[in-house]
Amino acid sequence: MARIAGVNIPDNKHTVISLTYIYGVGRTTAQKICADAGVNPAAKIKDLSDEQIETLRGEVAKFTTEGDLRRDVNMKIKRLMDLGCYRGLRHRKGLPVRGQRTKTNARTRKGPRKPIRK
């Protein structure tokens, strides 16, 4: 298994699919990385040379991925919560942030039902 951006990439899959195992790299970004690195997106990782894997590492390093991206997202959410704006309050209460209804549904965000206390 090749290791790119601190993630073990599966050897037996196409390069584009394997790169999506990195947090912050989707299909479009993976195709862009392959094009910039000059690597065939349909080639499997095990068939690539060490030089090609190094160029992929260099191209992935240009993007914000893994720990840095997770930290950025968490800092932005924390900033909203500190501001006390509507979106921050919704994050703090564990409710849907983007205007979805909560009378019914929203179970994923709210968690399991709590029994009514008397």
UniProtKB/Swiss-Prot annotation:
One of its GO terms (biological process) is translation. One of its GO terms (molecular function) is tRNA binding. The keyword Ribonucleoprotein applies. One of its GO terms (cellular component) is small ribosomal subunit. Gene3D superfamilies: 1.10.8.50, 30s ribosomal protein s13, domain 2 (4.10.910.10). Residues 92-118 are annotated as: Disordered. It holds the Pfam family Ribosomal_S13. InterPro entries: Rbsml_uS13_C, Ribosomal_uS13, Ribosomal_uS13-like_H2TH, Ribosomal_uS13_bac-type, Ribosomal_uS13_CS. The keyword Lyase does not apply. Keywords: Ribonucleoprotein, Ribosomal protein, RNA-binding, rRNA-binding, tRNA-binding. PANTHER family: 30S RIBOSOMAL PROTEIN S13/40S RIBOSOMAL PROTEIN S18, SMALL RIBOSOMAL SUBUNIT PROTEIN US13M. Located at the top of the head of the 30S subunit, it contacts several helices of the 16S rRNA. In the 70S ribosome it contacts the 23S rRNA (bridge B1a) and protein L5 of the 50S subunit (bridge B1b), connecting the 2 subunits; these bridges are implicated in subunit movement. Contacts the tRNAs in the A and P-sites. HAMAP family: Ribosomal_uS13. Belongs to the universal ribosomal protein uS13 family. Part of the 30S ribosomal subunit. Forms a loose heterodimer with protein S19. Forms two bridges to the 50S subunit in the 70S ribosome. This is Small ribosomal subunit protein uS13.
